[in-house]
């Protein structure tokens, strides 16, 4: 690559200023699939890079120490590309590794060497793109396009940025950005460690236009950055959720097949696994629509394809009304509304249940208590997410002084056992 800059200003042992810096790829690669004839030759550019330091910080044996680093009006373009097969079947490569001749060692080295420490970091008005010009592309179905990622308006304020032993760590006071898909982050803060296939964030607080998340601990595990091309099945997520609010509008940018899901709820608990195969532990949920609150433990497999998604869950002490239940189920339906409002109107039920099976063919064993009586049910629900067919309920039920009249809003019958 060629490294150019318009102006350099150096105040000995205090400040270094670079203006209009750019790193130009001499041999940009065309898209192997032929989907685009664009060659990305600019790897990096920045209007200003400013570093402030002391003589002591420069001559330390532990690595470069800077008091402050500022980057403004910058752009970085990462290109995923093919390389010749060296016999190991691995043809994945990228322009960063090619330009700087970075090679993956045959035996990974666990160096404890410190590379740098920066006390204060500020990045303003930066962009980042990641284009997949390789032959291995993940099909695009909507939301964020991991084959053509384009992030703008990146603003970062951070402190104690440290790179040692192959791990980057630091405290992010505030991070914000927007992606061309329409997704945007209004603010992120937390203490982060990134490296060796993991991103660990403590006290993560995230806010976008739809959701608000508070995670005392959050971790992503992945083989390498290329795993994010198939985020749903190759990036493992583990986290503790404090009092938060989730809107599925946020999730659809990462799992576009869930487009149309209108669920909004307050949540807290723990999750572990991949988007398409995860466990939830002690997840407390309260639907924004009301009438549907409780705790869930279990697993879900198959997302984002709702028709193939399976559930194995236990529901503890769920308080719900028929209005709340039908609103909750309707939010999972792309079209139409489920209406059970004429049944048991105004009555609250406490439910303990087990559910298993496909989302569209769900077996439920439930114990139901209320002021109008008690019931045990062993039923199957079908066509829950199929808007083209009516919901079908089959199975057996036992009641104990359950007021059927109040259940169906009729005076013709009373309590039944």
Q: How does the language model describe each region?
A:
Residues 6-86, 101-133, 150-173, 195, ...:
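Flexible beta-edge/linker motif
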Residues 73, 174-176, 208, 241-245, ...:
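Transmembrane beta-strands of outer-membrane beta-barrel pores
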Residues 29-52, 66, 135-156, 180-191, ...:
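Amphipathic hydrophobic-ligand
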Residues 244-248, 321-322, 406-408:
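Outer-membrane beta-barrel translocator/channel fold
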Residues 1-4:
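Extracellular/lumenal and peripheral-membrane lipid-interaction modules
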Residues 239, 269, 296, 313, ...:
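Membrane-embedded beta-strand positions of outer-membrane beta-barrel proteins
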Residues 250-253, 333-337, 400-403:
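Extracytoplasmic loops and strand-loop junctions of Gram-negative outer membrane beta-barrel proteins
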Residues 94-136, 152-180, 187-188, 200-204, ...:
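Solvent-exposed beta-strand/coil patches in large extracellular/periplasmic or lumenal scaffold regions
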